[in-house]
Amino acid sequence: MSDKTPTKKGGSHAMTLRERGVTKPPKKSEKLQQYKKAIAAEQTLRTTADVSSLQNPGESAVFQELERLENAVVVLENEQKRLYPILDTPLDNFIVAFVNPTYPMAYFVNTDYKLKLECARIRSDLLYKNKNEVAINRPKISSFKLQLNNVILDTIETIEYDLQNKVLTITAPVQDQELRKSIIYFNILNSDSWEVPKYMKKLFDEMQLEPPVILPLGL
């Protein structure tokens, strides 16, 4: 027979906490702990007095800073939605522009009197969504638009992509004017029907871009 008197599990430890006048912080303090690093607070709980001070989270400077930041985020999100309503609308187009010399361009006129424009440094992972599309290697003509000088062409006849050399070649009707500027627009979302945004075209119309290099007559 044991001479130990049964005691309530954890009773001795609980009595010690009560003697110290310490109680567990309310559940709100758990949220406070989760966000403590995010708000760059250096306050730490070094003594039992510090723990006791969290009994009323509303009186904690860290908790008040957390509430302030959360309210500021809500205000910022509402302001962004007001200024940029596009953030709440479905995204139908995502347009990338290739311009010379960032993407080096060169051209020639072949014997069929067609303009061949070559654009280098274009990665396959930008043109294609997956490895299957890369293997097929057929750029979708409707995803591209070509601007020569300040005019966006109505017609692109063919598009080819050299995987090894990362060169995109566009065939289009030859132009009567001297070619001073060329921009290739690519809609990443591959929409069949889309237009180049006016603000984007205006931007490139006003920019002084380097003209594409003229190559010898090709076949």
Curated annotation (Swiss-Prot):
Residues 16-33 have a biased composition (Basic and acidic residues). Residues 103-134 are annotated as: NEBU-like domain. Transmembrane segments: none annotated. Keywords: Host cytoplasm, Host nucleus, Late protein, Virion. Its main location: host cell. Plays an essential role in nucleocapsid entry in host nucleus. May act by binding and stabilizing F-actin in the infected cell, which might attach to nucleocapsids and then push the nucleocapsids into the nucleus. This is Protein Ac132.
